[in-house]
Amino acid sequence: YRYDLAPYTWKLVQNLQQGRALFTQPPMPIKCAGAPQKAMYLSCDHWLKSGRLAQINTQFYNAGGVLFGVADYVPALMKYVERYAIDLKFSHRLVAVDGPGKRATFIRTQADGSSETVEQSFEMLHVVPPQIAPDFIRSSPLADAAGWVDVDPATLKHRQFANVHGLGDVTNPSNAKTAAAARKQAPVVANNVLVALGRRDGAAVYDGYGSCPLTVEKGRIVLAEFTYGGKVAPSFPRWLLEGRQPTRLAWWLKARVLPALYWHGMLKGREWLAKPQKADTRHG
């Protein structure tokens, strides 16, 4: 990530008057699977409110086959896809960009497994690159065949080296790679390291929790929260915050509460709400 690219993207969005805007999403896993859509929805919201959306053809090229991996949140997102008249292109993987010529090249995977090359011109292109683990991890004995640290998805203990535990984006469990996941993983690893050192009894387990605040328009967020297997796992009662619908409360949480929680709670180990869950007999 480069800190200068967010304001650069915002400048492109503000300056685009008409034409074709392409937004891309690479194959999983990536950091926050909803991030490519967040930029797209906020851009479209700006164009809509500035009276330019009708002159801009927005296309979303997704290497995957679905809009979002947890089906419960798709209906709310589809309403915004329709509102912004976004053209969804599934199974399209970006492979090349001709910047000066303003052309993007994709590999489209067909239903029968065959593929074809697709080229598209653009006035604006928002690229989310494919993501891999750092070389020092990929080339180490800690990595699995795909290059990620190979840990048990529940205990986060390395499958081969009993004195190694892992957390965060570099590990191979199927959870969403988000700060919300790391927030839940860190206390589990801390507990289980103490167990391995003989200083605490009772292993803790991670349930795959992840969260993705999908910014569908300025002032409203669809707050996706889920565990392993795409099971919806809300932190708030539905009468207070219905995560499957866009709400202003979720925006307020993202804009006002989460930054303070991150800097003064998560990073300093002071957040009691992330207390680890102890393993039951199924985990030994």
Question: Where are the language model's segments positioned?
Answer:
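FAD-site-proximal beta/loop scaffold in flavoenzymes
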Residues: 1-17, 121-184, 195
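Glycine-rich dinucleotide-binding loop and its adjacent helix/turn
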Residues: 1-52, 153-154
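A structural signal for isolated positions on well-ordered beta-strands in alpha/beta enzyme cores
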Residues: 22, 57-59, 165
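Beta1-alpha1 glycine-rich phosphate/pyrophosphate-binding loop at the start
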Residues: 27-71, 276, 281-283
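A Rossmann-like FAD-binding core segment of flavoenzymes
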Residues: 48-146
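FAD-binding beta-loop-beta segment adjacent to the flavin cofactor pocket
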Residues: 147-165, 216-236
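A conserved FAD-binding loop/helix module that cradles the flavin
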Residues: 167-216, 223-225
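C-terminal auxiliary extensions adjacent to catalytic cores
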Residues: 223-284
